[in-house]
Curated annotation (Swiss-Prot):
PANTHER family in the cross-refs: UPF0473 PROTEIN CBO2561/CLC_2432, UPF0473 PROTEIN CBO2561_CLC_2432
Family: Belongs to the UPF0473 family.
Record Pfam families: DUF1292 (PF06949)
Protein name according to UniProt: UPF0473 protein ABC1595
Organism phylogeny: Bacteria, Bacillati, Bacillota, Bacilli, Bacillales
Domain of life of the organism encoding this protein: Bacteria
Annotated source species: Shouchella clausii (strain KSM-K16) (Alkalihalobacillus clausii)
Listed InterPro entries: UPF0473
Length: 95
């Protein structure tokens, strides 16, 4: 299976400071038709002694000529549980 190229995203924080993120993975939940993306800050190198902080968002692709993506906060415990399960599966596959 060919590995698809991951995208980079610039996301501002609550103070307006922009941060650059690499896409770790994305997935869509069939039952809700909601899509989620897990991102890692650029420059965060993973090693055996230190865990990398990851960020998860619900996202929607805009139907415009630029195919922009809008990010939304994850709001429910059920969503977080599902994202955590997907992250664990992703981590196991990477080992």
């Amino acid at each position: 299976m060919a590995q698809e190229e991951k995208e980079r995203f610039v996301i501002p924080d609550e103070n307006g400071t922009e941060h650059l993120f690499d896409e770790l993975f994305r997935f869509t939940v069939d039952e809700t038709e909601k899509s989620y993306m897990v991102l890692v800050p650029v420059g965060e190198e993973e090693d055996d002694e230190e865990e990398v902080e990851v960020f998860a968002f619900r996202y929607e692709e805009q139907q415009n000529e630029d195919n922009d993506i809008s990010f939304y906060p994850v709001e429910t415990d059920e969503e977080w549980d599902m994202i955590e399960e997907m992250l664990n599966t992703f981590s196991e596959e990477e080992e």
